[in-house]
């Protein structure tokens, strides 16, 4: 039994359309297998003669699966149950993505009419449905289980944001999900597929827990074969033994989108490239009668090919249709071909599952006049179902745990994540849950687990594979802003991650922002500490260069602009709080330097001094708690967020020139407190979120923290320019309503929404009573697109007094 813990490839599903086009172009550029390979010979085999070419094809395909070379026709498809001499019935299920739900409808009609299935061959989605059914799972049970999950999220490795470690959630605020490059001694690399298929394999492992590992698929309740393609040679590979979940995943690994599955040293991908309707495979298993279900997408009319991606997708569709046509020609007179009318259901349209199931049932019902001749009596069929039921797995007590790692992955990292120990009863679900922290951390290609029994020795094998496109990783993000109240700007984010520098798990992290209004850099080491709870120690250094606008007391008249440069070095101790968030505390040394951009007098009085250049230093102790359970950091529809930060200066010094700012600036120690809370609740396609935020400096004021709090910009008093209001005391509140008008499958755009928000708040300088004066208001009406590259929002914000701001922004960084 094999199970795989999951990790998130957030945003990947929204890139599906582009990747399909890439797959199409790649597949179309490959030459068809030459004569003598599995694909050509299988396609040219005659339906009435076992020619030498056909025999060579069968031998090639079977030997590719490590079966005996002389086992050209295995004859494992035996009529089991019913009257003596009845024909053995094989089921050939084609690939087609979400259209494959039609297979469930076919199976339900066959069950209702007591038509037995003696062997199954499946490709891609047909391999998924066929493999589960072959393991003994009834069609009704399969439909119920599939209806309780989001198969699209599972297939595309989408993990709930709340299940990610806090470091990954923080990265999401700056970097594009799924856009990660690796580099090493051999140069820059990218993953062979954006989706590793871990969640799907884990789900299949859970649902097939009764199936022993590394056994022939002939021993399943129904003999089974999965068809895949060797990525290197283009040959058809018929998988007939080993890990059932891995065989299924290999059969549906669409090149470019899903990473190849490695089996016996071969990189295997979607079998639809060579045999999307595996009639010949079912025949070689010994089926006397083949029920073939073709769910392939029809070719599109010429006027529907509106883009290069459409043309490339049509190209690969033609190639797949050719191998399907070849397989259909191998059907005999007694065979039955079903072609459900699936209309425009796309291969990614998992939301149309019920429609696809109904189409499959309708096609099978229409063919009942030909199918009923194979029906068994009620008594015979009851005996057949009993013999082919999914067995309950016996309890297995773990006698040994064997951890295998690749690359620079320390075994300690894996062992620390496991709570299971020798002598425990094996529970694949629990082990997968233990490994969740590893796979969702983003540093692994896969973490698989299986139990291998040899007599009384039951070994739990864990295989943790480092991402082969590492060990160094680059992350990228982009933010752009344009509005009617300021100049607009951009921010480009580049991150670097290097895990496992040492056997103890030391990680190096670096983040850089280059923007029109902000430049920053941060480097950090994270060293896990021995023991439980995930404690770590983190020395760091950071630099920030930003522009701060200074306004008069009304917040309307711009007086000057300061270039602020700050550096901070420090040492933190960190503690992850389960999957809720993170707590850090430590000590740091901060320096700051400010210089005015404009050589102007401070006021209009005669002899007034000019705005000064200043410098400040401070030694501080800081603690920060973050709890983040939002489903999206910018447009949350459900969840909650809390941040609490306290910083105390142990020593503080300002340069003499800071006296020009008045008596509020001093070398007296200060304490800065900041808090933010947000909650979001979803009601169908509607959602409401509320935010409160506040901050205050107590004691002296160092110019390093004099401009820490800002308001202005989208969702932060949107009627005002970005960071227009600056001070060291803050109060702010926000209520936002959103209506998700539509969602998109397999598109760079995830959702289209409209919304409105009401905001109130202000900032104050030191010594001014918080809440004194007028609280500024802003009312925003916006349209938002949630995209693979970050949120895109446009709208208008209004405020009393005729103030308004029209804006267009991309990214989460403004």
Report each predicted region and the residues it spans.
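Bacterial N-terminal signal peptides
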Residues: 14-27
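Solvent-exposed coil/turn segments that connect beta secondary-structure elements
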Residues: 138, 147, 229-232, 242-244, ...
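Gram-negative/organellar outer-membrane beta-barrel architecture
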Residues: 428-434, 443-624, 710-711, 715, ...
């Amino acid at each position: 039994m094999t199970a795989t813990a999951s990790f998130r490839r957030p945003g990947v599903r929204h890139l599906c359309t582009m990747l399909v086009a890439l797959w199409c172009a790649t597949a179309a550029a490959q030459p068809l297998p030459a004569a003598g390979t599995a694909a050509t010979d299988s396609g040219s085999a005659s339906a009435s003669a076992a020619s030498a070419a056909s025999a060579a094809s069968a031998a090639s395909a079977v030997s590719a699966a490590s079966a005996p070379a002389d086992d050209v026709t295995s004859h494992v498809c035996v009529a089991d149950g019913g009257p003596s001499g009845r024909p053995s019935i094989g089921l050939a299920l084609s690939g087609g993505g979400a259209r494959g739900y039609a297979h469930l409808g076919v199976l339900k009609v066959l069950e209702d009419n007591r038509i037995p299935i003696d062997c199954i061959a499946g490709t891609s989605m047909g391999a998924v449905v066929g493999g589960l059914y072959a393991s003994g799972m009834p069609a009704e049970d399969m439909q119920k289980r599939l209806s309780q999950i989001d198969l699209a999220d599972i297939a595309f490795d989408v993990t709930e944001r709340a299940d990610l470690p806090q470091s990954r959630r923080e990265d999401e605020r700056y970097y594009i999900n799924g856009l990660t490059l690796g580099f090493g001694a051999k140069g820059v690399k990218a993953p062979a597929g954006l989706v590793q298929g871990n969640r799907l394999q884990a789900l299949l492992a859970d649902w097939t827990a009764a199936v022993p590992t590394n056994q022939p698929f002939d021993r399943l309740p129904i003999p089974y074969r999965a068809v895949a393609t060797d990525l290197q040679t283009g040959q058809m590979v018929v998988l007939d033994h080993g890990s059932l979940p891995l065989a299924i995943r290999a059969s549906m690994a669409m090149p470019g989108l899903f990473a190849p599955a490695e089996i016996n040293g071969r990189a295997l991908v979607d079998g639809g490239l060579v045999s999307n309707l595996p009639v010949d495979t079912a025949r070689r298993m010994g089926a006397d009668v083949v029920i073939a279900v073709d769910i392939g997408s029809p070719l599109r009319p010429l006027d529907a090919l509106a883009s290069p991606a459409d043309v490339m997708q049509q190209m690969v569709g033609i190639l797949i249709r050719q191998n399907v046509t070849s397989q259909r020609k191998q059907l005999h007179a007694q065979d039955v071909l079903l072609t459900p009318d699936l209309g425009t259901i796309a291969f990614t349209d998992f939301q149309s599952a019920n429609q696809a199931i109904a189409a499959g049932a309708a096609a099978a019902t229409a063919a009942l006049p030909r199918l009923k001749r194979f029906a068994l009596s009620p008594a015979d069929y009851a005996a057949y179902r009993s013999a082919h039921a999914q067995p309950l797995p016996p309890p297995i007590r773990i006698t040994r745990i064997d951890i295998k790692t690749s690359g620079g992955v320390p075994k300690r990292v894996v062992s620390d994540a496991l709570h299971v120990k020798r002598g425990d009863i094996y529970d694949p679900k629990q082990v997968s849950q233990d490994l969740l922290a590893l796979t969702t951390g983003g540093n692994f290609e896969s973490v698989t687990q299986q139990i291998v029994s040899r007599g009384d020795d039951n070994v739990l094998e864990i295989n943790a594979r480092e991402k082969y496109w590492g060990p160094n990783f680059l992350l990228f993000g982009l933010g752009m802003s344009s509005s009617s109240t300021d100049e607009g700007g951009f921010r480009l984010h580049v991150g670097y991650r290097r895990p496992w520098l040492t056997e103890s798990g030391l990680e190096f992290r670096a983040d850089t922002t280059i923007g029109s209004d902000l430049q920053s850099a941060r480097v950090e080491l994270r060293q896990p500490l021995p023991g439980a709870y995930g404690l770590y120690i983190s020395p760091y250094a950071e630099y920030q260069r930003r522009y701060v606008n200074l306004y008069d007391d009304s917040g309307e008249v711009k007086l000057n602009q300061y270039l602020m440069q700050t550096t901070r070095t420090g040492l933190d101790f960190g503690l992850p709080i389960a999957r809720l968030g993170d707590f850090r505390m430590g000590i740091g040394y901060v320096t700051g330097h400010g210089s005015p951009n404009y050589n102007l007098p401070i006021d209009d009085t005669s002899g007034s001094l000019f705005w000064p250049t200043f410098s400040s230093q401070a030694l501080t102790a800081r603690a920060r708690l973050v709890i983040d359970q939002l489903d999206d950091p910018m447009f949350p529809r459900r969840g909650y967020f809390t941040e609490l930060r306290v910083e105390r200066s142990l020593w503080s010094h300002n340069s003499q020139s800071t006296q020009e700012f008045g008596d509020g600036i001093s070398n007296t120690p200060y304490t800065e407190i900041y808090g933010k809370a947000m909650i979001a609740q979803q009601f169908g396609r509607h959602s409401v979120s509320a935010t409160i935020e506040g901050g205050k400096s107590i004691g002296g004021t160092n110019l390093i923290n004099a401009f820490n709090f800002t308001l202005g910009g989208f969702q932060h008093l949107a009627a005002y320019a970005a960071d227009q209001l600056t001070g060291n005391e803050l109060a702010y509140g926000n209520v936002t309503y959103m209506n998700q008008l539509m969602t998109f499958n397999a598109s760079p755009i995830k959702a289209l929404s409209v919304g409105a928000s009401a905001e109130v708040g202000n900032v104050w300088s030191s010594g001014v009573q918080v809440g004194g004066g007028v609280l500024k208001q802003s009312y925003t009406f916006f349209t938002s697109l949630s995209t693979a590259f970050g949120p895109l929002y446009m709208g208008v914000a209004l405020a009393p007094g005729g103030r308004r701001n029209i804006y267009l922004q991309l990214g989460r960084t403004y």
